[in-house]
A protein has these predicted regions:
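Bacterial N-terminal signal peptides that target proteins for export
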Residues: 1-11
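Lipolytic serine-hydrolase domain surface
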Residues: 22-58, 115, 123-174, 193-408, ...
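N-terminal carbohydrate-binding/catalytic regions of secreted carbohydrate-active enzymes
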Residues: 56-72
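Short, surface-exposed "cap/lid" segments of acyl-processing enzymes
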Residues: 72-125
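Bacterial N-terminal signal peptides
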Residues: 10-19
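Gly/Ala-rich beta-loop-alpha elbow adjacent to hydrolase catalytic centers
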Residues: 181, 185, 189
């Protein structure tokens, strides 16, 4: 009877899972009666939605058409494309949080002074499949597998590339694009960056159009650090020192999902896998089992972390009463400094400090939990202010003192790749 009972339990769990799952249909479909349902207008900016199914296919290709038309019709667009993560979709709280960020950017003096017009593109998928307790938490690995399919199949990358192409084609030299991903969305963003870096390194695309955005940011990415190690090593071998960031991976030390849950799951999975000894990027010639990169995310792997946030324990008066986000967009601060809103209208001074001996345009930033508390705490004002500072550091339109862009199309220095 035991096998029968076990089978019955499995059937019951499966039935409960299926009965509680979210819809497979697009949540913002365009129709004959409402052909622009996937675009919403707000005060001063608009947001377009593009949705993908379980295998990474377009759920409604007209959503992409509408997004591209929006970019094409917007003068001097600042395009922010966002890929959400676990426990979100195109109707979750992430939508309102994303719109709130767009509204703050749209109202910032620095953005208005250079003539940017803010456009948001929200890339949606079923990051959330159930609200049932326990099943909700257990969906982490199921959703990770889905995110990996989205990242490896064609349509998601096609959308990301089409967005940047449209902005650059219609507004050459006047546009700026940002690709932002959270959690499993960060995994998708990182895979997109890897394809682009490889294409530029080998001359398949020139620097003006190779990247999926002018700046790519992943916040608390739920991905192993195998790809991160490979990309950092490739950039290090091309001698990309003293250049502005192209890709910034941000992870809070308080992120339990990627810091605790992720290594437990990948540690169990690693038992059945084989791992070579690989070179950690840098001049130290350190070899380590690749298992270390398979089981840890980039922001929890001390062999890859090359920046940390540091509280300078200084305060400054807010120029013109600006909040930290607006101030960080408006002014440069010494040594990759940035400000956070402090007490009594003052601004606290922090720094994104480079650590270690690997200087590449892939920033792997470990963030203090007072800025980002945990895995989902990415939309608070302190986190947004820090990201705004990174945005200025990497944006030569806003910041004429920005460092030069890295030249990637060059032969590698194999001495930087080989164990000696």
């Amino acid at each position: 009877m035991l096998p029968f009972r076990s089978h019955t339990v499995e059937i019951c769990i499966s039935a409960l899972w299926l009965s509680s799952c979210t819809s497979l249909s697009p949540l913002r479909p365009n129709t004959t009666a409402n052909p622009t349902n996937s675009v919403i207008g707000q005060d001063g900016y608009k947001v377009a939605f593009v949705e993908f199914g379980e295998q990474g296919s377009y759920q409604d290709p007209t959503q992409l058409q509408n997004a591209l038309a929006l970019i094409r019709d917007t003068p001097q667009p600042l395009v922010i494309t966002y890929v959400h993560g676990w426990q979100n979709d195109v109707e979750s709280g992430d939508v309102q949080s994303f719109e709130s960020l767009l509204a703050r950017l749209n109202g910032a003096p620095a953005i208005r002074n250079v003539g940017f017009h803010v456009v948001g593109v929200y890339l949606g998928w079923r990051g959330k499949i159930t609200d049932v307790p326990i099943l909700k938490e257990l969906s982490f690995w199921n959703r990770k597998n889905t995110a990996e399919r989205l990242a490896s199949n064609y349509d998601v990358y096609d959308t990301i590339a089409s967005i940047s192409e449209e902005a650059r084609k219609d507004h050459p030299g006047k546009q700026y694009t940002v690709l932002l991903g959270h959690s499993f969305g960060g995994l998708i963003v990182e895979r997109s960056v890897a394809h682009a870096i490889n294409a530029e390194i080998h001359g398949h695309a020139d620097a003006s159009r190779s990247m999926p955005a002018d700046l790519m940011v992943a916040v608390n990415p739920a991905a192993d650090s195998v790809l991160a190690r490979q990309m950092i090593a490739a950039l290090y071998s091309r001698k990309t020192e003293d250049t502005r960031p192209l890709f910034v991976s941000i992870t809070s030390t308080g992120d339990w999902a990627t810091g605790i849950v992720f290594p437990i799951g990948t540690g169990l999975a690693s038992v059945s896998k084989g791992f070579n000894e690989v070179e950690a990027p840098g001049p130290a010639n350190t070899q380590v089992s690749e298992r270390k990169f398979y089981t840890l995310t980039p922001g929890h792997n001390e062999m890859l972390i090359n920046h940390i946030t540091v509280d300078k324990h200084e305060t400054i008066n807010s120029p013109n009463g600006l909040h930290a986000l607006e101030e960080n967009l408006q002014h440069n601060h010494v040594g990759n400094g940035f400000t956070l809103d402090g007490a009594e209208g003052k601004l606290d001074v922090w720094q994104i400090k480079r650590v270690g001996d690997v200087d590449v345009p892939y920033w792997d930033v470990q963030v203090d939990p007072s800025i980002i508390k945990d895995h989902g705490d990415i939309w608070n004002e302190r986190a947004e202010a820090m990201v705004a500072a990174i945005f200025r550091m990497a944006n030569p339109i806003l910041n004429r003192s920005a460092k030069p862009r890295a030249t990637l199309h060059r032969a590698p220095d194999f001495n930087r790749l080989e164990h000696r």
